[in-house]
A protein has these predicted regions:
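Hydrophobic/small/kink-forming positions within alpha-helical transmembrane segments
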Residues: 24, 28, 60, 85, ...
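Membrane-interface helix-cap regions at the ends of transmembrane helices
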Residues: 5-9, 55-76, 143-155, 197-218, ...
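C-terminal transmembrane-helix exit sites in multi-pass transporters
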Residues: 95-97, 115-136, 255-276
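Transmembrane alpha-helices of multi-pass small-molecule transport proteins
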Residues: 42-90, 169-172, 191-208, 225, ...
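Glycine-/small-residue-enriched transmembrane alpha-helix faces in small-molecule transporters
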Residues: 2-46, 154-179
Length: 295
């Protein structure tokens, strides 16, 4: 490999890392705004109906610059994209409920268990082999989850299970994309991923219409813009990274740094020693899995 090739790879790697870090920041802003919204009197379907169109606008703009809208949403088969969309209904509902009752940092930490579920699901669905070191990381990582959960019957917060379920569902969705990637483009999958929950939200909204105050509406729109930008930056980062995704993937954990900062500044969230220990185990094992899985 000549010097010029090394410089190009180094430049692409740096840009991809920056894109991942920006996407993590955008996702953290989205979650912080969603927590504020969830503390009000509106339901998850009010949020998705008011903010969803802005997500669609950004997604459609992305399609226009990626082969056109028709090319991305007109498919030979709609079964798999619609199945993913149906699975995705649970995520906005659970995120809305969870953020109302648990801290931003704990929510983010448990969402970042996604690599654990990807490994497990890849083994059973894609028949991928798992290295022993990854198995050890999974065990230690889930011990970290148990430490955070603190499963004492008297004080157990059942809402803390929701982000874990979200990670499992997201893992299934990502495995489906991996297995059936020829059926649709990433933007096509994302479109139907948003469309199905949005249509359900519209039906529920018609039955119980509600428009919050202007400030909350601005927060809702902003959360959707930041969430969609996070998805855009993340998608583009992986598109650029090609053969070194294992070197950029660990940077998704920078989202936890922002979650801790935003949680403390805006919601006075403080984490106890158990949450700190559990979070460290999850992050270290998650990074280890992301590196080893592609290695």
């Amino acid at each position: 490999m000549n010097v010029m090739s090394k410089l190009i790879i180094s430049n692409d790697l740096l840009i991809s890392i920056l894109l991942i870090c920006f996407s993590s920041f955008f996702f953290a802003v989205h979650d912080s705004l969603l927590k504020y919204i969830s503390l009000g009197n509106i339901k998850w379907y009010h949020n998705i109906v008011i903010g969803g169109p802005f997500g669609f606008i950004i997604l459609i703009l992305m399609m226009i610059f990626s082969g056109g809208v028709k090319k991305n949403i007109i498919l030979k088969s709609y079964k798999i994209p619609i199945l993913r969309g149906m699975l995705s209904i649970a995520n906005p509902l659970m995120a809305f409920m969870a953020l109302k009752y648990i801290s931003l940092s704990i929510f983010t930490t448990l969402i970042l268990t996604l690599p654990f579920f990807l490994v497990i699901l890849s083994y059973y669905i894609l028949n991928e082999k798992i290295k022993k070191t990854i198995i050890y990381s999974l065990i230690i990582g889930f011990i970290g989850v148990i430490i955070i959960l603190k499963p004492e019957i008297e004080s157990f917060n059942f809402y803390i299970l929701l982000p874990i379920l979200m990670s499992a569902i997201s893992g299934i969705n990502m495995i489906i994309v991996n297995k059936y990637n020829s059926l649709a483009s990433p933007y096509g999958f994302a479109f139907y991923n948003l469309l199905i929950p949005f249509l359900l939200g519209v039906m529920l909204f018609i039955n119980e219409p509600f428009f919050p105050d202007f400030k909350t509406i601005i927060f809702i729109i902003s959360s959707w813009i930041f969430g969609t930008l996070g998805l855009l930056f993340l998608t583009y980062a992986y598109h650029r990274s090609n053969f070194y995704t294992n070197r950029i993937a660990p940077y998704i954990y920078t989202q936890l740094i922002w979650a801790i900062i935003f949680g403390f500044i805006f919601y006075k969230d403080l984490i106890d020693i158990y949450s700190v220990i559990g979070s460290i185990l999850i992050v270290v094992c998650g990074i280890n899995i992301l590196i080893l899985k592609k290695g």
